[in-house]
């Protein structure tokens, strides 16, 4: 009686990890292949696509001022250079974009500053 693919897969599924490693090594020797080479060749193609899709500009959105509105206003003023009246109007009109088209590092830093002031912030 010949083994089916399902029989082989079920047997492999029940094997401990160390036995699987030994099985892979034996298969590599028997058939003259290297399993890691196929993985290494496929990885850069996937990584290249991910890099092409990665965003480079981010928007920092103030979703809510939080419990301490005065601290949020001060943080917005410091980040944007707006006057007190403009910063207060921005905080009170949340959700609003505080800064648009900034780098990831700058967006994360601004988010951290606003959250420390008690504001609810999102980076898009």
UniProtKB/Swiss-Prot annotation:
Cross-referenced HAMAP family = Ribosomal_bL12
Q: What's a GO cellular component annotated to this UniProt protein?
A: cytosolic large ribosomal subunit
Q: Does the keyword Ribosomal protein apply?
A: yes
Determine if Cytoplasm is one of this entry's keywords.
Answer: no
Tell me where on the tree of life, at the top rank, the source sits. Bacteria
Q: Which organism is it from?
A: Idiomarina loihiensis (strain ATCC BAA-735 / DSM 15497 / L2-TR)
**What processes does the entry annotate via GO biological process terms?**
translation
User: What family does this chain come from, according to its entry?
Assistant: Belongs to the bacterial ribosomal protein bL12 family.
Q: Which Pfam families match?
A: Ribosomal_L12 (PF00542), Ribosomal_L12_N (PF16320)
Gene (name only):
rplL
Question: Subunit arrangement?
Answer: Homodimer. Part of the ribosomal stalk of the 50S ribosomal subunit. Forms a multimeric L10(L12)X complex, where L10 forms an elongated spine to which 2 to 4 L12 dimers bind in a sequential fashion. Binds GTP-bound translation factors.
Give the UniProt keywords, A-Z: Ribonucleoprotein, Ribosomal protein
Output this protein's name. Answer: Large ribosomal subunit protein bL12
């Amino acid at each position: 009686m010949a083994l089916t693919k399902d029989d082989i897969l079920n047997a492999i599924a029940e094997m401990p990890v160390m036995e699987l490693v030994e099985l892979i090594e034996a298969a590599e020797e028997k058939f003259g292949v290297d399993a890691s080479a196929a993985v290494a060749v496929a990885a850069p193609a996937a990584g290249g696509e991910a890099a092409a899709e990665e965003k480079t500009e981010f928007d920092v959105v103030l979703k809510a001022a939080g419990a301490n509105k005065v601290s949020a206003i001060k943080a917005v003023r410091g980040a944007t250079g707006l006057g007190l009246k403009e910063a207060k109007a921005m905080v009170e009109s949340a959700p609003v974009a505080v800064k648009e088209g900034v780098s990831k590092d700058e967006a994360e830093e601004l988010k951290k500053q606003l959250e420390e002031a008690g504001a609810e912030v999102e980076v898009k």
